[in-house]
């Protein structure tokens, strides 16, 4: 693999050994850092050869990155807070090679806003078995790690999630993610109409109360249904999971539907998709996701804007459920 210069003078020997050990761990760190940026094992191998002038096999690179697997396990099992005011659940899809066949797998990310108003990734799981049974196991895992109560869970229409939340956390409010709702509505709308349609949708979710929101829903449906017949169907079908937002003040709503927190995290995850079209295994995907998460969350030091006001309002609305 690689050789180190030897020195004849025996009194220098211990120093050389120390230096050599340090160099190896230093290279490990560099390999892990490159992997975190989404580079493939082949790209890392080529970069190591360019920089250090020695060859490393792709399996060696893979073995080095496997050293973080115990760390991932510890992180996935770490104790969590008893109460989270808000959780966001999202899915990002990746192509993964499985016994020579390329499959689409989802990485499910749960992001929490804790009682201090700080963001925290609770867990990441990779799978293709989206169902009420699967989501119930995810919810129970959170409970086993110490979570006793969640006020609001925001998620897209993931199969079975609503039922699983109701079973595991009966008092928790399920809120459809407004950003996804809007995105799904506009998905098949051509550019020429998209801006006007998006502006009209805003009149629904930014309405001051539910009555005005329903009136806006009727107006928008009447206006756009002739041109795009199914575009507004999801709003009517999902209304019971969209409407909880109207009981909150603008400040709280902004925290709930301005999903900057999860959107910025997602852009980090999407970068991985751009850098690799296919992951060699679900373990390789999990390693890349964990390292990308670790990099992204290092910058998360600030509290959510207006958190004191948000917390105060949530404390009144969900009486006795938040620590004072």
Language-model regions, residue ranges each:
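DNA-recognition alpha helix
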Residues: 42-53, 291
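Acidic/histidine-rich catalytic cores and adjacent linkers
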Residues: 170, 203-324
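Active-site beta-loop-alpha junctions of metal-dependent nucleic acid enzymes
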Residues: 22-23, 124-146
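Short, small-residue-biased leader/transition segments that mark boundaries at the very start
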Residues: 2-9
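Conserved beta-strand -> loop -> alpha-helix junction used to position metal-binding or nucleic-acid-contacting
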Residues: 152-159, 164-200
């Amino acid at each position: 693999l690689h050789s180190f210069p030897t020195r004849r003078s025996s009194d220098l020997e211990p120093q050389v050994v120390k230096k050599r050990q340090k160099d190896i761990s230093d290279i490990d760190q560099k390999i892990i850092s490159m992997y975190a940026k989404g580079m493939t094992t082949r790209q890392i191998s080529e970069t190591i050869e360019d920089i250090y002038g020695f060859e490393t096999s792709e399996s060696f690179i893979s073995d080095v990155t496997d050293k973080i697997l115990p760390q991932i396990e510890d992180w996935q099992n770490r104790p969590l807070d008893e109460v989270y005011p808000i959780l966001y659940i999202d899915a990002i899809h990746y192509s993964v090679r499985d016994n020579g066949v390329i499959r689409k797998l989802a990485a499910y990310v749960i992001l929490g806003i804790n009682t201090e108003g700080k963001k925290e990734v609770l867990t990441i799981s990779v799978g293709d078995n989206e169902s009420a049974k699967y989501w119930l196991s995810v919810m129970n895992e959170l409970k086993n790690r110490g979570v006793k109560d969640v006020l609001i869970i925001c998620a897209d229409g993931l199969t079975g999630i609503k039922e699983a939340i109701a079973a595991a956390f009966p008092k928790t409010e399920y809120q459809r993610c407004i950003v996804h709702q809007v995105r799904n509505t506009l998905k098949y709308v051509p550019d020429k109409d998209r801006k006007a349609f998006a502006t009209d949708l805003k009149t629904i979710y930014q309405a001051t109360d539910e009555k005005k929101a329903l009136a806006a829903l009727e107006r928008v449906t009447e206006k756009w249904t002739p041109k795009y017949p199914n575009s507004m169907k999801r709003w009517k079908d999902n209304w019971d999971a969209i409407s909880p937002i109207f009981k909150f003040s603008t400040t709280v709503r902004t925290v709930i539907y301005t999903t900057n927190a999860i959107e910025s995290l997602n852009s980090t995850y999407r970068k991985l998709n751009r850098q690799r079209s296919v992951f060699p295994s679900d373990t390789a995907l999990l390693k890349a996701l964990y390292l990308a998460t670790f990099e992204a969350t290092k910058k998360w030091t600030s509290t959510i804007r207006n958190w004191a006001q948000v917390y105060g309002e949530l404390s009144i609305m969900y009486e006795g459920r938040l620590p004072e």
